């Protein structure tokens, strides 16, 4: 009799997966997101271990091998897999070391814009009649300007360089986090659990950071992923315009700028950095789509 009562409890069909396992199953179901994750893991590995992965120092010049084509083309050298640039520097080594800066800029700008964006969004959501309108009008003004133009203006004021590039991209990304956080907060404030917390005597800070904010993180995680790809793209654009990281530091946008005069007779010095930017941004966007599908209950149920 006891065995009959205990049988349903041991039925595997009644055992629910953990939230992490359920998230991974939903994310891995999206083949594009999984491919993007694998590509980004490769980029991160190369960036972290660049001194050991790269065949040469990114600034080392081989004067006898200027604009050498990739190894599979006529005139290529096996020692230079992706060829060399106009100064005889190994292109593969510069791309690998350039990944470090691109990932650093993307991660730093996301963190710098995410934290104040969440705080301002919470303040705007909890103060809809006072601070909220002022914050949102300021965000509307920032959104009215093209993001790249605003970033160029900020860097032009602060001066070119790595830190100023990160600051400019972070400022440009700020309105998206503020608006998204405020919208999520306004939705959550009408939930029963928030009302129950108020009646239980929870203060404003507890409501903000303990009750409401954890339930707003799913869209913010997706937005942070998409902003990461936008930051890499903006950093490359600023570097191409000469306002980002300055030569001879290897950075994908700067590599494009220095090689644009050789596009007709040495296509690889322009195409390969551009292709690296394209694939990295595409991989991160695919990851963002997978995260959105895995974290959004509506999309998960629809699937």
Swiss-Prot record:
Reported phenotype of the disruption mutant: Deletion of the dppBCDF operon leads to reduced ability to utilize di/tripeptides as nitrogen source.
Domain ABC transmembrane type-1 per the UniProt entry, residue ranges: 99-288
Single GO MF annotation: dipeptide transmembrane transporter activity
Keyword check for Protein transport: yes
UniProt KW Oxidoreductase keyword: no
Biological process according to GO: protein transport
GO CC terms, sorted: plasma membrane
Cell location: Cell inner membrane
Pfam families on file: BPD_transp_1, OppC_N
Keyword terms: Cell inner membrane, Cell membrane, Membrane, Peptide transport, Protein transport, Transmembrane, Transmembrane helix, Transport
Membrane topology note: Multi-pass membrane protein
Domain of life of the native organism: Bacteria
InterPro entries xrefs: BP-dependent_transpt_permease (IPR050366), MetI-like (IPR000515), MetI-like_sf (IPR035906), OppC_N (IPR025966)
Function in brief: Part of the ABC transporter DppABCDF involved in the uptake of various di/tripeptides. Is also involved in the uptake of phaseolotoxin, a toxic tripeptide inhibiting the enzyme ornithine carbamoyltransferase. Responsible for the translocation of the substrate across the membrane.
Family membership: Belongs to the binding-protein-dependent transport system permease family. OppBC subfamily.
PANTHER family reported in the protein's UniProt record: D,D-DIPEPTIDE TRANSPORT SYSTEM PERMEASE PROTEIN DDPC-RELATED, OLIGOPEPTIDE TRANSPORT SYSTEM PERMEASE PROTEIN APPC
Known partners and oligomeric status: The complex is composed of two ATP-binding proteins (DppD and DppF), two transmembrane proteins (DppB and DppC) and a solute-binding protein (DppA1-A5). Five orthologous SBPs (DppA1-A5) are present in P.aeruginosa, which increases the substrate specificity of the DppBCDF transporter.
The protein's name: Di/tripeptide transport system permease protein DppC
């Amino acid at each position: 009799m006891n065995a009959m009562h205990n049988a349903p409890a041991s039925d595997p069909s009644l055992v629910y997966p953990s939230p992490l396992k359920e998230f991974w199953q939903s994310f891995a179901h999206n083949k594009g997101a999984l491919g993007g994750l694998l590509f980004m893991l490769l980029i991160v590995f190369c960036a972290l271990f660049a001194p050991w992965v790269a065949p040469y120092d990114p600034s080392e010049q081989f004067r006898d091998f200027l604009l050498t084509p990739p190894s599979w083309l006529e005139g290529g050298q096996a020692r230079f897999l992706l060829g060399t640039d106009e100064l005889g520097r190994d292109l593969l080594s510069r791309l690998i070391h350039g990944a470090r800066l691109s990932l650093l800029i993307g991660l730093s700008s996301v963190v710098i814009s995410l934290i104040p964006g969440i705080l301002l969004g919470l303040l705007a959501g909890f103060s809809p009649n006072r601070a909220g309108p002022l914050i949102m009008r300021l965000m509307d003004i920032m959104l009215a300007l093209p993001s790249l133009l605003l970033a160029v203006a900020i860097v032009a004021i602060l001066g070119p360089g790595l830190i100023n590039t990160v600051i400019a991209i972070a400022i440009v990304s700020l309105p998206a986090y503020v608006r998204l956080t405020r919208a999520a907060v306004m939705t959550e404030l009408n939930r029963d659990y928030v009302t129950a917390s108020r009646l239980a005597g929870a203060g404003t800070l507890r409501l903000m950071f303990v009750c409401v904010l954890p339930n707003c993180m799913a869209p913010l995680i997706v937005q942070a992923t998409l902003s990461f790809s936008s930051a890499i793209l903006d950093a490359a654009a600023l570097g191409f315009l000469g306002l980002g990281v300055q030569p001879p530091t290897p950075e994908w946008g700067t590599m494009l700028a220095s090689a644009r005069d050789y596009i007709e007779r040495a296509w690889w010095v322009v195409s390969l950095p551009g292709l690296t930017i394209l694939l990295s941004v595409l991989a991160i966007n695919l990851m963002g789509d997978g995260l959105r599908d895995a974290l959004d209950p509506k999309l998960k149920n629809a699937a």
